[in-house]
Amino acid sequence: RIMYYKIPTIVFLFFHIAFSETIYVPDDINSIQGAIDASENSDTILVDPGIYFENINFNGKSIVVSSKYLLNNDSLLIGITIIDAGNVGSVVTFNNDENSNTILQGFTLQNGNGNNEDPDDNGSFYTYGGGIYCENADPLVKDCIIQNNTANEGGGAGIFCFDSSPAFIGCIIKGNETDDVGGGLYARDNSSPSFSNCSFFENLAEFGGGCYLKSSS
């Protein structure tokens, strides 16, 4: 007689569990960009009030970067948590396929003068996006003041969008200036930025002081 035995098979499944972390600036890392560089997707970066003289790039990460406004909705924190580019480059850059899981909230963005970019890839470089430069990206920007930025010989002093559809909620775009187009906003090449409860005022440009749209909506 032949005996058959069933030998149980045990399968072990190993799961990688990702835990989100909160990084505090300047307590943990003394610069916002340094915190972004150290972060992983789903992390939150909380920034104390102060003036941060730097330019930041989200580098495609799905993270939240916020002032302490995130904790208590105290609007006074927006005006005293400042990212200041010191008239060197764009204050904030999104150009690595960021989406709505990339969130910037509760800052004043000021004194950017645009970058030196060629989004058309035709060898012509211009200064775009003093406050925010957005190329091939769809981030979410909430409760920010975008002010006193420039972008001469290009445009989009406050915000520049190229093939991008960022969403802006509760933002103020004011006092931005360019001798080209789009003092507050310059959106082009299939861009569809959206604005909810936002205000544009005292923005200046040769054409389109508030906004200038080209092949965009």
Model-assigned labels for residue ranges:
Residues 27, 62-119:
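Right-handed parallel beta-helix/beta-spiral solenoid domain characteristic of secreted/periplasmic
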Residues 80-95, 118-133, 152-161, 177-188, ...:
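Extracellular beta-strand/beta-solenoid scaffold signature
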Residues 1-2, 16:
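Short, Lys/Arg-enriched N-terminal segments with co-localized hydrophobic residues
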Residues 4-12:
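Sec-dependent signal peptide recognition
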Residues 21, 43, 54, 61-63, ...:
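The right-handed parallel beta-helix/beta-solenoid scaffold, focusing on the short coil/turn
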Residues 12-20:
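Hydrophobic h-region of N-terminal signal peptides that target proteins for export
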Residues 44, 67, 80, 101-113, ...:
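Right-handed parallel beta-helix
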Residues 21-53, 57:
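Acidic Gly/Asp/Thr-rich repetitive segments characteristic of extracellular carbohydrate-active
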